A protein has these predicted regions:
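ATP/NTP phosphate-donor binding region
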Residues: 1-86
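Glycine/threonine-rich beta-strand-loop-alpha-helix active-site module
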Residues: 69-119
């Protein structure tokens, strides 16, 4: 029996995809990205993530996730969006849930980059 999954709209997996984040933002029609990343990702992959946006001269803001998906955390990142027109969540489940909520309540697209097999 065949199963069809219609979500997400686009699924990309592969080596070196972090280097293409700005390209994927542009494909979504975005001009400025708001990146929400967990501390481990920030400490480990910050330069790799930034290089994607610097190469394509794409505007972005990167913020570290506070650790809990809460109303306070969602509002904090909504208020920090500024002119960003896409949210990118990079990390584990709580980081991605917060990024999706910020996106939903701000009515802008989201890209999620799971870093754990469970998400």
């Amino acid at each position: 029996m065949s199963k069809v999954i219609c979500s997400p709209g686009c699924y990309i997996q592969g080596n070196g995809e972090l280097k293409k984040l700005a390209e994927y933002c542009a494909m979504a029609g975005a001009k400025k990205a708001y990146l929400l990343v967990d501390k481990f990702i920030y400490d480990t992959y910050k330069s790799e993530i930034e290089s994607s946006f610097k190469t394509d001269c794409f505007k972005y803001t990167m913020e570290i996730f506070g650790g809990e998906c809460s109303e306070h955390e969602i509002h904090k990142h909504q208020n920090a969006l500024g002119q960003s027109d896409i949210v990118i969540g990079i990390g584990g489940g709580k980081t991605l849930d917060t990024a999706k909520a910020v996106s939903f309540y701000s009515n802008i697209p989201v890209i999620i980059v799971p870093t754990a097999a469970s998400t």
